[in-house]
Swiss-Prot record:
Disulfide bonds: none
Chain residues that bind ATP: G37, A64, G87, D88, G89, K90, R101, I102, R103
Keyword match Aminoacyl-tRNA synthetase: no
Organism: Escherichia coli (strain K12)
Regulation: Formation of the GlnK-AmtB complex is influenced by intracellular pools of the effector molecules ATP, ADP, Mg(2+) and 2-oxoglutarate. The rapid drop in the 2-oxoglutarate pool upon ammonium influx and a simultaneous, but transient, change in the ATP/ADP ratio promotes AmtB-GlnK complex formation. ADP orients the surface of GlnK for AmtB blockade. The GlnK-AmtB interaction is also controlled by the level of intracellular glutamine and the uridylylation status of GlnK.
Domain observations: Interacts with AmtB almost exclusively via a long surface loop containing Tyr-51 (T-loop), the tip of which inserts deeply into the cytoplasmic pore exit, blocking ammonia conduction. Uridylylation probably sterically blocks the T-loop region from interacting with AmtB.
Signal peptide, first to last residue: none
Superkingdom in the source lineage: Bacteria
Protein name in UniProt: Nitrogen regulatory protein GlnK
Summary of the function given for this chain in its UniProt record: Involved in the regulation of nitrogen metabolism. Regulates the activity of its targets by protein-protein interaction in response to the nitrogen status of the cell. Involved in the regulation of the ammonium transporter AmtB so as to optimize ammonium uptake under all growth conditions. In nitrogen-limited conditions, GlnK does not interact with AmtB, which remains active and imports ammonium. When extracellular ammonium increases, GlnK associates tightly with AmtB in the inner membrane, thereby inhibiting the transporter activity.
Listed GO biological process terms: positive regulation of nitrogen utilization; regulation of nitrogen utilization
Binding locations of ADP: T29, R38, Q39, A64, G87, D88, G89, K90, R101, I102, R103
Annotated positions of the O-UMP-tyrosine modification: Y51
Xref: Pfam families: P-II
Amino acid sequence: MKLVTVIIKPFKLEDVREALSSIGIQGLTVTEVKGFGRQKGHAELYRGAEYSVNFLPKVKIDVAIADDQLDEVIDIVSKAAYTGKIGDGKIFVAELQRVIRIRTGEADEAAL
């Protein structure tokens, strides 16, 4: 099993959610986060003064999947989140040792 973590621009959340749903992904966790990468941040003008905004708003999506879904998930998320502009985001993949559905006690892939 894998844990796929995706950091994207907030306005792409619904596109990514719909794309994941279209391939049968039924559950995900979404968190509003702030961060920066190569994009660094940007300057904003407020009441005539320029301010530096170092952390940009992003959305983090966590989804637990079976190993055989990994390539399809990466492909569909990459396409759905793409704008071609700096700051499109990142996809991180980690091994999942165990998953337990608390209500039923189901474990591992049965709990996904």
